[in-house]
Amino acid sequence: MISVTVEVDVDRPPPEVFNYLEDAENNPKWIPNMRSCRWTTPAPVTVGSRYEQTSEFFGRQIHTSFEVTEHHPGRLVTIESREGSSFPLKVTRIVDARADGGSHVTEEVEGDPSGFYAIATPLLRAMVVRNIRRDYKNLKRVLESAPQ
């Protein structure tokens, strides 16, 4: 089992940050190894909404189906991979307001790798931490450089 938590401060208002994060189709814009991401259910995002994504990790294409399993608009969204995905994964993204009007973002990732990935669990955890930190630096850069 892999469990990782990453936090970042973003100098943008929480509603803007949350709206960007909850729309999975934005993922390829700030996650470099994300190749594609599309909703398979209609808007708005709510518990039960689903999307498909393709990413690359360890040089392998990873196809994952996700479902929103918890949703508190403006603050928290949890997604979980569904059957047929490369490996079980649960991701929770939380956006909290800072006193200065900016946002504090927390991402909690839990995964249970199997097959090829299970063999490499210690290396996999280190790479996941590194990649998520890089991703959230990108998120900060993308959102803070966007016109207000």
Predicted segments with their positions:
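Hydrophobic ligand-binding cavity/cleft-lining segments
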Residues: 1-40, 46, 148
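Hydrophobic/aromatic beta-strand elements that line small-molecule binding cavities or substrate pockets
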Residues: 6-8, 39, 64-70, 89-97, ...
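A short, structured loop/turn motif at beta-sheet edges
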Residues: 14-15, 42-45, 69-74, 94-104, ...
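Short beta-strand segments that buttress and anchor functional surface loops
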Residues: 49-56, 77-84
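Short, cysteine-centered beta-strand-loop-beta hairpins and adjacent loop/turn segments enriched
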Residues: 56-62, 113-116
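Beta-strand/loop substructures that line and gate deep hydrophobic ligand-binding cavities in soluble
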Residues: 80-134
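Short amphipathic alpha-helical signal-transduction/dimerization elements
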Residues: 128, 132-147
